Structures are given as C-alpha cells and as structure tokens.
Curated annotation (Swiss-Prot):
ATP binds at G481, Q482, T483, G484, S485, G486, K487, T488. Residues 203-227, 276-295, 802-824, 921-983 are annotated as: Disordered. Residues 44-166 form the Calponin-homology (CH) domain. Belongs to the TRAFAC class myosin-kinesin ATPase superfamily. Kinesin family. KIN-14 subfamily. It holds the Pfam family Kinesin. It comes from Arabidopsis thaliana. SMART domains: CH, KISc. This is Kinesin-like protein KIN-14I. It comes from the Eukaryota. GO terms for biological process: microtubule-based movement.
Amino acid sequence: MAATATEDGGLSFTVASVMEDVLQQHGNGLRDHDLVSRRAEEAASRRYEAANWLRRMVGVVGAKDLPAEPTEEGLRLGLRSGIILCKVLNKVQPGAVSKVVESPCDAILVADGAPLSAFQYFENVRNFLVAIQEMGFPTFEASDLEQGGNASRVVNCVLAIKSYDEWKQSGGIGVWKFGGNIKPPALGKSSFVRKNSEPFMNSLSRTSSINNEKAPSENDSNKLSSPSSLSTLVRAVLSDKKPEDVPKLIESLLSKVVEEFENRVTNQYELVRAAPRESTSSQNNRSFLKPLGEREREEKSFKAIKKDDHNSQILDEKMKTRQFKQLTIFNQQQEDIEGLRQTLYTTRAGMQFMQKKFQEEFSSLGMHVHGLAHAASGYHRVLEENRKLYNQVQDLKGSIRVYCRVRPFLPGQSSFSSTIGNMEDDTIGINTASRHGKSLKSFTFNKVFGPSATQEEVFSDMQPLIRSVLDGYNVCIFAYGQTGSGKTFTMSGPRDLTEKSQGVNYRALGDLFLLAEQRKDTFRYDIAVQMIEIYNEQVRDLLVTDGSNKRLEIRNSSQKGLSVPDASLVPVSSTFDVIDLMKTGHKNRAVGSTALNDRSSRSHSCLTVHVQGRDLTSGAVLRGCMHLVDLAGSERVDKSEVTGDRLKEAQHINRSLSALGDVIASLAHKNPHVPYRNSKLTQLLQDSLGGQAKTLMFVHISPEADAVGETISTLKFAERVATVELGAARVNNDTSDVKELKEQIATLKAALARKEAESQQNNILKTPGGSEKHKAKTGEVEIHNNNIMTKKSESCEVEEITVNSPPWPPVASPGQAYREDDRSFGSSEWVDKVMVNNRQDEMRRVESLWGGATTENGIGILPEDFYRRDLASDTSRIFSEHSYNIFMGNNNSTDDLDAATSDSSEPDLLWQFNQSTKIPTRSNIESKLKKPVSKPIRSPQSRNNSNNTVSRPLASQKVGNGPRGMKQFGPADMKRKATNARH
C-alpha cells in the first residue's frame, strides 16, 4: 500500500508501516508486563552466571568486592577498577594483560561517581579492552562501567571469555565461535519483539548509530514491505479475542492508524516548510526527480543527526545532574564525617572517664580482696592453731578420736531413701521413724566425712596422727561398722587399685617413707610390717607364702616388743614393697559372699607397722608401732542369710565385737578390771586401748533406710568410744644415758647374784641345815636360780642390753632367734626376788651407814659408789652370747597391765602389792656371802615367768608405790606358776 505524495514529492512512509507500528504497540501493551519480567530474569541469570564464574576464577578473597548475585549497580562497582577483569583474562590467556595495578583502597568504600585512580582507569580497564579486542572477544565501552552504563555488554563480554575458557579446557577442538545472547526457548514463536520501540513520533528514525545508516534502513524497509509481518501481527492481535470483540477491536485499530498517519504527514510537512527558501525550490525540483527511496534515506539521515544532537543534550543534562548529585553526596559525606568526628571525640572522652572509674573501682576491689585474703589467711591460721591445740589436748587427755564416714549409695540404689539428715564438719543427723512421725537424732564426733569425701581428704585429716609414729608414739587406727559399710574401702581401697583410690594403709606407709627420706640427715629409720588376721578366734599370718596356717599366740608383754612375735616381720623400704605385701595379705585373707555384700570380710585384719629411728647425733633410739585394723562388719543373720561356715564366722565376728564393746564400756566407766582377755581382738588391741597409744576409730555407716537400726547402734557405740580417756601416750625413747644406766643395772644384778650364790653355798657347807634357821632369825634374802628361760618369758626387763642385735628377726623362721635366746638364757643365773622385812629402825640405820635414801615404802636406794665398785667385775661372760631385737622396749607399764589382766587370784595380787622390801646392811651382806646355799631352787619353765626378776632403782630414780618400783611375788604365786608349768 502506497501513500499519497505531497506537493514537494512522495511521503517517506507507507500505510503498511503505520499499521505495523500500531499493531506492535498494541501487542506490546498487552504483553508488556510479562516481557519485562522475562527480560529482567534473563539479564539477572546471565549476570549471576558471569559473577559466579569471575569469583571462581579469582577466588572468594580476590572477589570480595563482587557479590555472588549482584545487581547491575553491584556488578558495575565490582568491576570498574578493572583488577578482577585483568586477573581473569590473565588466567584464561596468560600474559594477555602485561601489568595489573592493584587497588590502593577498598572499592566498596569509594563513593559512587567519585573519580577512580588514574592507574586503575587508564591502565587496568584500557589494557583489558585492548587485550579482548585483539583476541576477538565482544567488547564494551569504558563508560559502561560508570553509573548509567550498559551492563549487558559487560556481561556479554565476560560470558564470551568464559566460553573461550571452557573451549580451551575441553581441548580446543575445532574453531571457537561465541554464540552471543541466545534467547531461552520460552521466548519462542509467540514472542514478537521489535528492534526499536520508540514512540510514534520517532518511528521514522529506527537506526542504531550514525556509522551504520544504510543497512538498518534497508532492513527496516524490507521489514515494512514484507506482507507476512503485517499479517502475522494481525493474527497475533486477533488470536486471543472473542468473535464478538473483533469488530470493536478493528474499529479501534483503524482509528489509531488514521490518527498516526495524519500525525506523520503533519510532521513531514512542517519539516519541509522549515527548510531555507532558496534551497527549497531546487530541492523540490530535484525531489520530484529523485527516487522515493533516496529521499527517504536523506530524511532518515537528517532525523538521525537531529536525534544525536538531542541525545548529546540529554547526556549533558545527565552529566550535570550526576555532578550535582555527586556534589550533594560529597557535601553530605563531609557533614557525616564531621558528625562522626564529634561522636568519636565524645566517645573517646566517655571511654577515658569510664577507664578512670574502672581503675578506681578495680583498685578499691583489690584493696577489699586483699583485706579479705588477709582475714582468710588469719582465719585459716587460727583454725590450724586451734586444730593443733585441740589435738594436743586430745593427746594429753588420751581420748580416742572418732571419725565418721558415710558410704555413698551403690550403683542401682535410689538416693531418695537416704537416712542422712543434716551433716556438718563434726555433726551428723540421722532421720529415724518414730511413733509420731520422723525424728532427727544428732551425733557429734571429731570429724564427719560425707558420701562425696575422697580418700585423699580422709587421709589428710589423720596424717599428723600417723606421722607421730616416727616420733616414737604407738598409734592405732581401726575401722568399725556393719558389713558392707565401706571399712575395707577406707583402709585398703577397692579391688582395682589406683593412685587416687588407695586406702589408709598404702597412704600411711607412703607418707612414712616420705618423711623418713626427708629426715635422713638426722635420723635413720628402719620400717617393718606384719599382717595378721583373727579368723574364728584364731590368729593367722597373712604374709606366709607356703600356705601354712600355723596358729599364733598374742603376747602383750613379749620381750621383743611384738604383740604377735611368731608372725612374719618383713622389712620394707618403699611403697612398692608394701603393695606387694598387701596383695599377698589380701589374697590370704578370708572373704565371702553374703546377701549384704558380695565381698564380705570374714575376719579382722591388722596391718602392724614397726618403726625404729636412731638419732645420728645423740644416738637416741625411738620406737613406734602403728596398728591399722580393718574389723569385720557386724551383721544380722536374718539379713545376711548366712548358713554353715558363714554362720559360724558371723557368730565369732559378733562375739569379738561384743567383747570390744565390753572393753570400751569398762574403760568409759573407769572400772578397775577391763576384760581384755575375753577375745583375741581385744587382747590384740590391749596396748592401744590401755593408754599407751594414740587411738583413732573410723566408724562407717550406710545411708540406706533398711539399715537405720544398725546405723543408730553403730553411732551410739562410737559416742561411748569418744568418752573414753586413756591418758597421755608415752614416747618410746631410749637415750644414750638410759642405755648406759641399764647396762650398769644389768651388770650389778649379775654380780650381786653371783656373790650371793657363792655366799649361800659357803654357808651351807659350813653349817648344814643352818640356812633356814638364819633366814628365820634375820629375815634374809631368798634366792631362786632360774636355769631354763624360754623366748616367750617376760623375765627380760627393759634394762637388758640391746647392742649388737640384728635389726629384724629372720622372716622365714621367726622362732629361730628366740631358740638361741633360750640357750643363752639357760646358762645364766638370775636372782628372782628379794624379800626383806619392813622395819623402820633398820632402814634408818641403813640410811645412816650407806648415806643413801629410802622411799616411802622403806625401800633403800644404794649410792652410786656401790654400783661403780661392782663395774670392775667380769660379767661380760653372762651376756656375751645374747642378742635382742630392736623392738624391745621398757615393759614396766605393760607388766602392770599384765598384773591387772592376769589370771592370778585377788588375794595373791593384794599380797604382791602390800609386801615391802629392805636392803640389808653391809655387815649382813658380808655375812651372807660366807653362807652356802642350802638348796638351789629352779623355777619351772612357763610362758609368764618374767615377774621373777629384781628391779633395783638408781639413786637418782624415784621409786613409787606399787609394782612399778619393784615386782614381788609370794609363795602362793610361785606355787601357782609351778602348777601351770606342769600342765
């Protein structure tokens, strides 16, 4: 369809082109929303793809300015420095960009539109554009990286480089060719997109640039003249309309076509009329001669030039607007910087003020904490002094220390049924069920340990008591409680022993070794151990290795200082030796399984530690002994469900514990008679409970509700034990002076015995039968010679010599040394007793003649000159073959205990205590030496004949009342001992 010509010539457009423009605008209006969204999605997808590839190529750190999903503005800001582009191109094509200038500052912090660094702009971007142009990649303008630039061309360039990189990595097969911007399949045949979508007023100028004018014009004319495009547009407009709407739509389209046609004609007429008059005529004349197509091209060229001018004006306005915005932003940033400076100054002043206040507060808190620390140290110091003073008071009183320990619940037991109420440092409360509900009973002891107490805490509290063994004291620690309450755990530890779970036995010996090592420059200590058990009232050695169960005897006053002298005495020098011995002892100990405990101790075990220390400076000897007793638990047969041998064991255990309770009750009431010999257990603990040792009882209880009866009974017994006062413990200390005096006493006794024996024999030879007459007339000395003495006898007083004795008896045969002692004692002669009538006038005469003193009982004390004169006597023959154990000590006090607990009748004891002695005068002694012995008397061999020796005190020694000064026995006692010896 052709248009009519004007007066100057033909029109530059046709009706078909007008119709096509109207139809395209109509179709675009209907699909404008979907098309914009699809284009935006396509552009974003390509932009994200390019950004992700760039980030992978340069790394996350290098591409920190480029987000993974950037907007057009974010992509422009990330790439405008050119650093990322140059680095990527160098990775794809090494050496493509010879020099890359790094950014001096973070690109994100540079204000939008601010001039970039000259190095970045001219070096990086220019070098990149030159390189890609040489390589044949799609290029873009440097202004595209500025605000308002075309980001799609930048994305297209990046994707081209990506495609080239993938082609190279695949092997470079074939010829590389970039496909450009391929539209997705979703935008297929149904999409009708125009190249140029300008308004109707600018529809005549559809060229893209001045440099390429003819080709687009020809393409446009071809498109306009193509009838298929017009019919396609008509079908697209009418395809989705109803039949009844078609007439209205056609009418509307025709009206728009007419209106558009008229507008274009008017515009062309105005353009022609505005041309200069002189050229108008010639142009009009030539216009009729020129072809229609040439005139159209000239008009389009003119329109393009005008459009370019218009675009340049628009760009200038945009540049001015951009500069104004940048200036506004710059001013705003200056104001913000000033505000930030003011805020920084205020914040800095506030921080300085807060720092000053903080320092003042910190100084105040430091002074306060220092005061609290000083007060706390003072409190702990006072507490430690109070504890030491309390322990000293307890030592002076001789009270038995009582510690209480609560066993934790076993695995699988519920802790909600606990009977333990309030628990403090020295007080424990037990919840008991009463008729009116629950009640709380409180008990007070020296120390209370809860279920969470560790073995280290338990041992640290009794450590000073254990260390006193090295100072010469005897110590006894025994664990008491019902079966399954944790006694063996406290004393020995669990079955699987570790360093943290070691019991008192291991820790005590380890601490003794440590302290002995610390004192090695001043003291030399020898330590040996015994381990025995009392099983069914029989004493057995737990350290035997041959499996023999030889029955042992307990001797409270043995000459060796050992309670069980026949038991193995093993020297130890380290904790490892102790662990090996304890393993042997635990292996030999009697244990069994009951309903209350799967590993119940069926015997009382006692670990005895013997310590002898010698002062390297003075030569004084200190002897200490420590009993660590693990008592078998008391049990009720109906709960333990024992039968047979277990029942017999339980009966013996309960009987021995009952005997221990009787002894404690007697000691608490200060009864004159204490039944130590009712049980082997009390006989073993006699030295400890009799006032010669520091004693500690560890009472153990279970927290279960079904054991509340046994718990109350155990705690009541412990309360009675706490009331017992045994008196101050005694130090077993033998100084060099004491040893010398003992040797003098022994020598004088031997000399006196020999001389009196010779005198008796001479008198008997001279006057047969006259000795008894002389004895009845003057009340002289009766001499009994003991030719046979056994190792178990108690006749060896503390005055006997201890030099040249081996440190320990042989372990393999502990009785061998004692048999040798028997032979040596069998050849010696001893004076048993001296009985003198108590006459006051003769004592005064003795005192006036000898210059000595008399005691309150009339016993004469000889001056030292008498003893010095007899030192010249050769008495070494009597003692040269005898050797003693290092654990022999002064047994005077133990003799008293034997007297108090022996089987002798009460009249005999009263007779012994009421007899008085008298020292004869010098004339009487000389006359007696001339008299022969009428009849030698040999005492029978027995175990307890140590009471037959004479105890003569020195002049400097005070002799008191009772058997401590001199031990005396009458005829009745001698008769009883002779009878016992026959049986």
